[in-house]
Amino acid sequence: MKHSTYYSLPSLVKAGKKKAHKKEVISFDLFDTLLIRRIHDPDLVKLPVARYIADLAKQQGIHKGWQTIQGWRDAIEREHRHETAKTFEDHEACYPSFMRELLQKVFGSSFDESLLQQVTEYELAMESSMLVPRQAL
């Protein structure tokens, strides 16, 4: 598949509109296209989320270190990516699926869907604080 590079939002939109009438689906990578991160390693956003989950667990009498939780997340996310790669080219993991699995592992029978919602909102807030719109080159 041939990929094109555009150096301004207007040129990207123009090309997208031109190609759109011939396609059912058009996709592009949002990150580094329209948005850039303020940090060099996007995985660094995951660390405060692991701390947040550890704090939530501690409130319920579950004592797991954030490093343990982060290790579990990495392993679960890696397994989900591996499973996706069997069917799709993108090797992406579905956030609600892997995060639900992680939270079930951490909280056991105390898990409920409101925890997933809480953690998702926290992670989105962390992610949003790291994003800025890309300026034209």
Residue ranges and their predicted role:
Residues 12, 136-137:
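Well-ordered alpha-helical segments embedded in enzymatic catalytic cores
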Residues 13-71:
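Active-site neighborhood of HAD-like aspartate-dependent phosphohydrolases
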Residues 128-135:
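Catalytic cores of eukaryotic secretory-pathway lumenal/extracellular enzymes that build
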